[in-house]
Regions:
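C-terminal beta-sandwich interaction modules and adjacent acidic
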Residues: 1-418
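Positively charged, low-complexity/disordered segments
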Residues: 417-428
Length: 428
């Protein structure tokens, strides 16, 4: 009997691009008449988003926005802020044009500088850092069985995971609500931050139907310098592509907030203003199907002398998503002579996830920031705290998506002699 070989396809995920790159942004802005005039810049906070990332031929084209929120002391001696949107576009060359590419692009603020040219004009310069990753599935043929010519085969079952989706997608959510009666109608917006809860989702016909709830906190300042807080709930729902995903696939969907843009509408003196909120969010989508099949690992012939040639394959195997809360505490000395802590918040400064043999390592830094009264004037302060967590996993971590969120859970202020310290506990 003649030798007959039976082959089966194996799905291999090929990395086309995995780099960090930068895109410069800048703005020369005139303050509108209704903004208080600038006395001194306190802080420029930057949040970034990726609105679209597409592959066109041998190029990856990324469009996004850097949202800059500039805190400053007004000429009246009170804190104020103004928000500027800086759009950007970046094109990155690929080594080849992929078929059915999976695209995941993360954006971070790089260096940024902000200066007041005069009391009504701002100059902003900086760069957005982009981590671009493009992968594409490809097929490789592997021997499943051989017969004839006295062939004897040894086979073993192998898990061959097929990566259905490993990418990010940008989306926008909006909400509107009238402010509470206790807030002055002439209050100005100082800061807006948002957080989004865990997503619930269901796989239906190659789609992932996902829902979550976002909460936006508005910090407003009255004409006498008093701060007010208001919360606004915004539902988030999206239908996400995950071709091939069904109820048996291992899936994960989560949402993170890239930036929050809020505006107050002008109203009559006897009416409360409306708050309009726009959220830029990133949906993190991961879907994988595990299949087990039998493949040849050794063979010999009882009729002929045989030689073997082997080729290594990296087989994927999907595991359940890992969710981990990491408490972080920081005790922060405030500026000398500090009085009342007016406002405080927490934000991610750095984040990274690295896989290895039997573990997943999460590292980064959290920035604790706030405004405090010093000598009757507002001052900005901040403190960086590192975090690190190693999570044991079964096998070697390869393709992965890691999204980070941070939320200020608790704070307490303690006076130690002439020094004020705060202890804050966020998680991610």
């Amino acid at each position: 009997m003649e030798l007959s070989l039976e082959r089966k396809p194996m799905t291999v995920n090929e990395t086309i691009l995995d780099i960090n790159t930068e895109q410069a942004v800048e703005s020369d802005m005139l303050l509108a008449d209704y903004y208080p005039r600038i006395s001194r810049i306190l802080r420029c906070c930057v949040e970034t988003s990726v609105d679209q990332a597409v592959v066109s031929g041998e190029r990856l084209i990324v469009d996004g926005v850097a949202l800059c929120r500039v805190f400053y002391k007004s000429e009246e001696g009170r804190p104020a802020s103004v928000t500027v949107k800086l759009p950007y576009t970046k094109a990155v060359e690929l080594r080849r044009a992929p078929q059915k590419p999976q695209i995941a692009v993360q954006s971070y603020p790089g260096y940024f500088s902000c200066r007041a040219v005069n009391s009504g004009r701002l100059e902003i310069r900086g760069a957005v850092v982009l981590h671009c990753r493009v992968t594409a599935p490809s097929e490789a043929q592997a021997l499943h069985w051989a017969e004839g010519s006295g062939m004897q085969c040894r086979c073993r079952p192998l898990c061959c995971g097929q990566l259905l989706r490993c990418s990010t997608r940008s989306l926008t959510a909006r909400g509107e609500e009238r402010l509470s009666d206790g807030i002055p109608s002439d209050a100005a917006l100082l800061r807006a931050t948002s957080r989004v809860g865990d997503a619930t989702f269901k796989a239906v016909g190659g789609k992932l139907v996902a829902k979550a709830d976002a909460v936006t906190e508005l910090v407003l300042i009255g004409p006498d310098g008093t701060l007010y807080r208001e919360e606004l709930e915004i539902p988030v729902s999206e239908i996400l592509d995950a071709e091939g995903a069904d109820e048996n696939a291992i899936c994960s969907v989560s949402f993170t907030v890239d930036w929050t843009d809020a505006k107050l509408s002008s109203v009559a003196a006897d009416e409360q203003p409306m708050a309009s909120v726009e959220l830029s969010l990133t949906a993190w989508i991961w879907a994988m199907a595990n299949e087990t099949d039998s493949f040849m690992t050794d063979c010999f012939s009882t009729c002929y002398e045989t030689t073997q040639e082997t080729r290594p394959f990296q087989l994927l195997r999907g595991v359940e998503p890992v969710h981990r809360n990491i408490p972080i505490e920081a005790e922060i000395p405030l500026p000398e002579g500090s009085g009342e802590v007016m406002d405080l918040w927490a934000e991610l400064a750095e984040q990274s996830a690295a896989g290895g043999e039997g573990s997943l390592r999460l590292t980064g830094r959290v920035r604790f920031a706030g405004l405090v009264q010093t000598g009757g004037e507002p001052e900005y302060f901040e403190h960086l705290a590192d975090f690190s967590e190693e999570i044991p996993v079964d096998g070697t971590v390869g393709e992965q998506l890691a999204d980070f969120r941070v939320e200020l859970q608790r704070s307490e202020e303690r006076r130690v002699g002439k020094e004020c310290r705060s202890r804050w506990s966020p998680y991610h």
